[in-house]
Amino acid sequence: MTKRANIGGAAALLGLALAAAAPAGAQQPSDGKTVFDKWCAPCHGDGPGRPGTAALQALYKGAKPALLEKRTDLPPELTKQFVRTGVSVMPFFRKTEISDAELDALAKYLAPK
């Protein structure tokens, strides 16, 4: 066997070993909080400069929480619809941005407990 074949075989074995050693959750979809923090919080998070939160605060005038994470009336189907189709000035998000699995996790995270 040549030196080149030995190196190629060793590299293949190393790749298999690394794949087998990957954490169990490595291929699992993100949890809903992680998805929210990445895609939603820039507009719908707490604090100044959050246009989504400001718009909901103006709309609800205290009748409902402006912070999505504090709402108790967001069924998963509604969250999924808003994310995929957008609403008012909120853009829609493609499956290449938020996968179906991530959207499921997000909708579950924001759903009434």
Could you describe each region identified by the protein language model?
Residues M1-N6:
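N-terminal secretory signal peptides that target proteins for export/translocation
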Residues A10-A19:
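Bacterial N-terminal signal peptides
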Residues L13, A24, A54-A55, T85-F93:
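Hydrophobic transmembrane alpha-helix bundles
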Residues A19-V35, R50:
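Electrostatic cytochrome c docking/interface patches
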Residues K33-K64, Q81, V89, P112-K113:
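Periplasmic/extracellular electron-transfer cofactor-ligation site
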Residues Y60-T72, L78-K113:
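Axial heme c-ligation environment in periplasmic c-type cytochrome domains
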